[in-house]
A protein has these predicted regions:
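Local beta-strand/beta-hairpin segments that build beta-sheet-rich folds
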Residues: 10-11
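Extracytoplasmic
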Residues: 1-4, 14-83
Length: 83
């Protein structure tokens, strides 16, 4: 799989626990898109707004776009970030 330098930031959570609780739902919603992604590329960390987000790192732009379209359809924020 060809990997590019794009990251996706999903959601804005006030606490680490709330991000951890929502993470399985986000991953299951996108399981078909994430099947070839290394688990180490998916993590929860603080974003620039000092809230917690789920990040999917080092993916192609096409995959990032698909993830965000699906995630936004579930009324969850999603941003594509160039690495």
């Amino acid at each position: 799989i060809k990997r590019n330098n794009f990251n996706v930031q999903i959601g804005m959570y006030k606490t680490l626990v709330s991000a951890e609780e929502d993470m399985p739902n986000i991953l299951l919603l996108n399981i078909d898109l994430l099947v070839d992604i290394d688990n180490g590329s998916i993590q929860i960390r603080k974003n620039k707004e000092q809230k917690y987000s789920i990040f999917v790192n080092k993916i192609t732009y096409a995959l990032a776009e698909n993830l965000c379209v699906r995630t936004k359809s579930q009324e969850t924020s999603c941003s594509i970030l160039a690495n």
